[in-house]
């Protein structure tokens, strides 16, 4: 392991011990805000500190085994070789674990997220596919014990959605879902296709972290254009007799959000404002990330929702992730929400990229 990384780890252990001491300080115990902040820092440092102490112990075990390998007794030397082998394997495993623990954490990873799905090229079939994607994500959320709340939906005439916006709440939702942003393509024979030809349709998916109230950007009332209209269902029929639906336009950025799922105009406005704030913050973060990572591959995408990330091929039962050249033949399981076999390899590739950046920096 590089000396610079060892120094960083030793500094973290020192801070861990300092925080441990502070948590027993009467002044800290009497200040709930400070106690909470230090408790959170303590829990964040605990795993990396424990792992580093195991690494140091493994190094000591290796040194002791190497000394034993110089003994005159042949049986002792043989035993020492086994211990050297075990210690080296342990050191290698712990080194990998420590490097992953040192990767800078995305502060958004623990947050809830907004999921946007929009039908793209392909007409009615794209709308049906948008419905398939929403069902897939809903099933996945159910398996994870998360809660899905529809914020806004625009139903397609033939089923599915022209647009669907949902909020997903639970543990580490954004960190799990963030790599889903991008273009999703489907290849299948539509039910209306009499010749049995395979058609290609597409949807775009955007995943944005929910912004805590304290971190919300200041949005001036003068920068907003708010329109009210009657909520409509499929085919344009009005499903509400009052103008409860809301359309908010953020004039400086041109961002538009509609919400019509609640009967109350007030609730629709609150939902639309939450999505608008998330979109504005996400757009700013994407611009900043693009400026920083022009020369580095970014699995989170360029911010261009048309970036094709995945293809779902029904005739072959195949799902392909184009970012990491991954293909699996488990389409039915994936559509039923069994997505971990798709998500884990992308996360691992992302961590490998971050480790490469960490190595360059150190």
Swiss-Prot record:
Keyword Ribonucleoprotein among record annotations = no
This entry's Gene Ontology molecular function terms read: translation release factor activity, codon specific
Known InterPro entries for this protein? PCRF (IPR005139), Pep_chain_release_fac_I (IPR000352), Pep_chain_release_fac_I_sf (IPR045853), Prokaryotic/Mito_RF (IPR050057), RF-1 (IPR004373)
Q: Where in the cell is it found?
A: Cytoplasm
| Lineage top rank: taxon | Bacteria
Q: What is its main location?
A: cytoplasm
Where, per the database record, does this protein carry N5-methylglutamine? 237
Q: Which GO terms describe its cellular component?
A: cytoplasm
List UniProt keywords, sorted A-Z: Cytoplasm, Methylation, Protein biosynthesis
The cross-references to PROSITE patterns, in alphabetical order and at most eight, read: RF_PROK_I (PS00745)
Family assignment? Belongs to the prokaryotic/mitochondrial release factor family.
This chain's function reads: Peptide chain release factor 1 directs the termination of translation in response to the peptide chain termination codons UAG and UAA.
Show the HAMAP family listed in the entry.
Rel_fac_1
Give the matching NCBIfam families: prfA, PRK00591.1
How is this protein named in the record?
A: Peptide chain release factor 1
Q: What organism is the protein native to?
A: Vibrio atlanticus (strain LGP32) (Vibrio splendidus (strain Mel32))
Question: What gene is this protein translated from?
Answer: prfA
């Amino acid at each position: 392991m590089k000396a610079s990384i060892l120094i960083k780890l030793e500094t973290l252990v020192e801070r861990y011990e300092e925080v441990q001491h502070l948590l027993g300080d009467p002044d800290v115990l009497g200040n709930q805000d400070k106690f909470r902040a230090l408790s959170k820092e303590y829990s964040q440092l605990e795993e990396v500190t424990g792992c580093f102490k195991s690494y140091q112990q493994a190094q000591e075990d290796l040194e002791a085994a190497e000394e034993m390998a110089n003994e005159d007794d042949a049986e002792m030397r043989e035993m020492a070789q086994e211990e050297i082998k075990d210690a080296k394997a342990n050191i290698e495993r712990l080194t990998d674990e420590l490097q992953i623990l040192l990767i800078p954490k995305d502060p958004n990873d623990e947050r809830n997220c907004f999921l946007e799905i929009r039908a793209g090229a392909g007409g009615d079939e794209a709308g049906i596919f948008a419905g398939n994607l929403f069902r897939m994500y809903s099933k996945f959320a159910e398996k994870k014990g998360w809660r899905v709340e529809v914020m806004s939906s625009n139903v397609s005439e033939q089923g599915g959605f022209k647009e669907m916006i949902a909020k997903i709440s639970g543990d580490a939702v954004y960190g799990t879902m963030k790599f889903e942003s991008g273009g999703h393509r489907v290849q299948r024979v539509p039910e209306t296709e009499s010749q049995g030809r395979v058609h290609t349709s597409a949807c775009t998916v955007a995943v944005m972290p929910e912004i805590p109230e304290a971190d919300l950007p200041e949005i001036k009332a003068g920068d907003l254009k708010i329109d009210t209209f009657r909520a409509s269902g499929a085919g344009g029929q009005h499903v509400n007799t009052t103008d409860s639906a809301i359309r908010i336009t953020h004039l400086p950025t041109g961002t538009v959000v509609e919400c019509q799922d609640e009967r109350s105009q007030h609730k629709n406005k609150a939902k639309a404002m939450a999505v608008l704030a998330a979109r504005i913050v996400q757009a700013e973060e994407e611009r900043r990330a693009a400026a920083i990572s022009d020369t580095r591959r970014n699995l989170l995408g360029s911010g261009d929702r048309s970036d094709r990330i995945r293809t779902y091929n029904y005739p072959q039962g195949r799902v392909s992730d184009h970012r990491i050249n991954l293909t699996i033949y488990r389409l039915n399981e994936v559509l039923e929400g069994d997505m971990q076999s798709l998500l884990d390899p992308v996360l691992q590739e992302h961590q490998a990229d971050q480790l490469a950046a960490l190595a360059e920096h150190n």
